[in-house]
Amino acid sequence: MASLTDRIALVTGSTSGIGRGIATHFASIGASVMIHGPVDADAQAIAAELRDAGHDADAVAGDLTDPDTCRHVVRTVVERHGGIDILVNNAASTLRGSLEDSSVELWDMMMAVNLRAPFICLQEAVKSMKPRGGGSIVNIGSINAYVGMSNLGPYSVSKGGLMTMTRNAAGALRNYRVRVNQINVGWTLTEGEERVQRLDGKGPEWLTDAIATRPFGRLLAPGDIALAAAYFASDDSALITGSVLDLEQFPLGIFPE
């Protein structure tokens, strides 16, 4: 199993879903974890749960649509812990919208959260990682970066941009031993996905119907993504940078039958 002992990690969007799964797993394998979410009480509650379980955890809150808040979140980690070793850019919005019908306001919000925030957080984290001799940045992307969906136009574009940024950053930061990798996530069962399905008018049967389309008999779980993130964050992947892991049950180019 990967070890993150003595590593300082920030996981954005870690008060629920995939982010919470990643942060919890990181804490369980030795990392000092900074929980982040838009609501301070939620972030503090998750951090308290981890501390009660014997782990090292702290919390910071903030709206990542604001560039100054992005900087503040990363700087808070550095100020409290003396540096940062691992950044997981997980926070994202999956609001629905087609390329034809989405408002400019929706487009701008999606790009701010899903693409600009990871960019700014990366910029700030690298300032600490370089003098520390390196670090690991893990971007949480989506299979939609490749194929898109008619009702996820802006979202898909933002995740495609994130993948391009991952590869560019990996090249630019290689000589500082800062590694940048990405996990493109497929259909995952989270509280947020449940909420979106209900907003789309689906009843409780949506999950049974969804599972029936999956060749391995279930949707992804946050724990699946957490294991992959721990690999990229740890020394198990010490010489891997610029890689994109597609965590999906359908290989690229294979259509569901």
Pin down the residues of each PLM region.
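Conserved glycine-rich cofactor-binding loop
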Residues: 8, 15-16, 39
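Substrate-binding pocket helix/loop in short-chain dehydrogenase/reductase
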Residues: 98-99, 106-108, 210
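Residue(s) in the substrate-gating loop at a strand-loop-helix junction
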Residues: 142
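Alpha-helical segment proximal to the catalytic Tyr-Lys
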Residues: 127, 171-172, 238
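Short C-terminal tail/terminal secondary-structure segment
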Residues: 147, 241-257
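Short, small/polar-rich loop/turn modules that mediate ligand/substrate recognition or access, typified
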Residues: 88, 174, 179, 240-242
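Active-site helix of classical SDR
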Residues: 122, 158, 166
